[in-house]
Regions:
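Alpha-solenoid helical repeat scaffolds
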Residues: 1, 13, 26-32, 46-47, ...
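Structural motif corresponding to the intra-repeat A-B loop/turn of tetratricopeptide repeats
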Residues: 2-5, 39, 99, 135
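A structural motif in tetratricopeptide-repeat
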Residues: 5, 15, 22, 56-57, ...
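Repeat-solenoid scaffold signature
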Residues: 19-55, 121, 129-132
């Protein structure tokens, strides 16, 4: 409030005092870091921002975005200024895919311990996967999906047709990009039939019942 009213010096003193009284309060560190950055005190600013990320990983994503803007995508400088913690790496991976820097995205992602990919940073992995799908980097997306998959999840593999015999149910909605999908429209009619089969327990039936051939 003081800074907005023109008292930047008073605002700085108040924030420094707050950080002194509550050194582990991440919101104070984050606010102080942004204040220092606006004052052109870059070195001090990112020390505070880094401390905010250390105590609250929710600040990792905005810290990455901010550092990216300040250092124009220089990853060495970004890591130097906000650190290379696992939380930062997990945020950098999907962010870098948006910048089409796939190799660097995977370098950061693959440095995260395998178990943490499935647990602590699974949500980041899902974001990473979705960004790769959007970028049409399907092989890489499949790699990430296998890394974050739960034991009960479907298992997809490169060069392998999933559910080729339709012994598993076809999802009517929310199917993976690597799974079978039912398209819109009324033709053909698609169903699974246990009475007509060549192997297994059932076959896929396609019924064309259109008077105009469409």
């Amino acid at each position: 409030a003081r800074e907005r009213s023109g008292d930047a010096v008073g605002a700085g003193k108040a924030l420094l005092k707050a950080a002194e009284l509550a050194p582990n309060y991440s919101e104070v560190r984050w606010t102080l870091g942004n204040y220092l950055l606006r004052q052109g005190r870059e070195e001090e600013a990112f020390k505070e921002i880094s401390k905010a990320v250390e105590t609250d990983t929710r600040y990792a994503n905005p810290a990455v975005v901010l550092a990216w803007q300040v250092y124009d995508g220089d990853l060495n400088m970004i890591a130097q200024k906000i650190g290379d913690s696992t939380a930062i790496k997990a945020q950098l991976s999907p962010f870098l895919v948006k910048q089409k820097r796939f190799d660097e995205a995977f370098n950061f992602w693959n440095s995260i311990p395998d178990e943490e990919k499935k647990t602590t940073y699974r949500k980041n992995g899902e974001d990473f996967y979705n960004q790769l799908i959007e970028a049409k980097s399907f092989r890489n997306a499949l790699t990430v999906q296998s890394q974050i998959a739960k034991p009960e999840d479907e298992k997809f593999a490169v060069g392998t047709l999933f559910n080729p015999d339709f012994e598993q149910n076809v999802k009517p909605a929310n199917a993976s990009v690597f799974d079978w999908k039912l398209g819109g429209g009324i033709q053909p009619q698609i169903s699974l039939d246990a009475s007509q089969k060549h192997a297994g327990t059932r076959s896929l039936i396609l019924l064309y019942n259109s008077s105009d051939g469409k």
